[in-house]
């Protein structure tokens, strides 16, 4: 079965997946549980199923599970129409994915990837509830984009089998996965995780367990500074995004990108950086805080720095 899809950027050209059979055998991982059926969870399920693994997806909200199923089917159908995968590939992969609102469906997985909201308390509770349901050898991973892997691992009964796997959004299209060891992570766990990620057709960037790791340590302060630039009246939403697209050759402006990521996620990462590094340069912009308080979280709520309720996005400031 073909391995996970490799793409250059959102809307970019997709490459044909490569075979991952040998890597799957070496990793001893055959089945994968995914907790969280949101944007990240369904994207991870998508690439993992295409790579030949059995997938069990869990979310506490049945509507999230139903939406994830529809999203995965729609995105795979789009790949078929573009010639990235065949119709047989799609139907075979879809049959590998099971959906359930019951956490016990995850219990027999060889690897469980947590992809819940970027809230440490929520993630810790998930792992506390999950561990008694798992078989002894199951490896645990978190898709956190900023939270300490060591702290998350500490609430489990297997910190040596715990690792950070930070996939980029959207998962089927983005090449990179950050791989993060906690202080207790064993070498075998790291090796198994590395082989697994490579079997998806992804490229690994290894990061130490510092707040926000590599990508978001660099990216989110830039986005936060763009919000400050808007907050202070230096430029409008349109002018800020245009300046960075055309002046720095970025594929998306920072405010457009913030809406795509989710303003709540942006705020969570900035709070982790601010609290973890104790440096005022990471203080979240008050305007970002206000937007999140208002429920303007970006594309997923149809309002953020742009209003998405019409035919095309309109800047809100």
Model-based region annotation:
Residues 139-208, 213-217:
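Rossmann-fold dinucleotide-binding core
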